[in-house]
Amino acid sequence: MKNIVLGGGCFWCVEAVFERLKGVIDTEVGYSGGNPNPSYESVCNGDGNIEVVKINYDEKQISLLEILTLFFKIHDPTSIDKQGGDIGIQYRSIIFYENEEDKILAQNFIEEQQKIFSKKIVTKISRLQTYYKAENYHQHYFINNPNQGYCQAVIAPKLQKIQSD
């Protein structure tokens, strides 16, 4: 089993996509990259943390390259601190790696993707230093709240788009 931690906008959206994938064992939303011991309120108030999803996966069933490819399909890696209507540093695009092999793979992936994108890719690659699990009510949010307004307006269409691709 391996882990990768991704930030690409609202963590509810990112988790909703990855928790459905074959080979993904578990997902957990949290915060990384800012002040210690964050809360949702402190993150929304700009404490420097990023909304992220920790993805625990079986590399025999799904590769990191497949995960990163999907990650770049579900968010805009050329947008600085913004995804759709979600604006703020907590929504920046980032790949937190745990080992050098994953770092190199991510760097090579972005280099190849840049040949496809007309705008500059701003996704950062950084070693995971600290990770804080988000509050329980954020975990598996779409599964637990499928009829909530944001879920219907933003997450459900994203899932439909991915399924049709």
Swiss-Prot record:
It is an enzyme of class 1 (oxidoreductase). It catalyses: L-methionyl-[protein] + [thioredoxin]-disulfide + H2O = L-methionyl-(S)-S-oxide-[protein] + [thioredoxin]-dithiol; [thioredoxin]-disulfide + L-methionine + H2O = L-methionine (S)-S-oxide + [thioredoxin]-dithiol. The active site is at C10. Signal peptide: none annotated. Pfam families: PMSR. Belongs to the MsrA Met sulfoxide reductase family. NCBIfam families: msrA. Has an important function as a repair enzyme for proteins that have been inactivated by oxidation. Catalyzes the reversible oxidation-reduction of methionine sulfoxide in proteins to methionine. This is Peptide methionine sulfoxide reductase MsrA. The gene is msrA.
